[in-house]
């Protein structure tokens, strides 16, 4: 899973969260922290060619207060983050979209470069440490 990953070689289109699920599908999640953040953001459709599934994630308080005003296309899923437990619930599943093979390859390479310990631009990079909780 990566945060703030550039999805296109042009411009500044960066997805909040990019992950690969168990089926090998690329999933992009756009995090919305408040109503204004969601209401003014009209770029979600630009992410669709770069993923198999696309989700918006809202806090439980934002979802409870504005779910009737949040209108999304059928292809977008909704995740709700609990402010008390920190768990995420899929309120609405995302449709599974097909990706162009060349785009999928490019996304996998972007994730691999991001995870690598070496960058041709920055020399040796820091090693990522993943902690397991029990």
Cite the ranges covered by each PLM segment.
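Short glycine-rich, polar/acidic loop-and-turn segments at beta strand-coil junctions
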Residues: 5, 19-21, 32-33, 60
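Active-site beta-strand-loop-beta-strand hairpin of nuclease catalytic cores
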Residues: 15-28
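Non-catalytic C-terminal interaction segments of nucleic acid-processing enzymes
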Residues: 3-5, 9, 67-134
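Gly/Pro/Ser/Thr-rich low-complexity, intrinsically disordered segments predominantly at protein N-termini
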Residues: 1-16, 36
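Catalytic cores of nucleic-acid endonucleases
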Residues: 26, 33-82
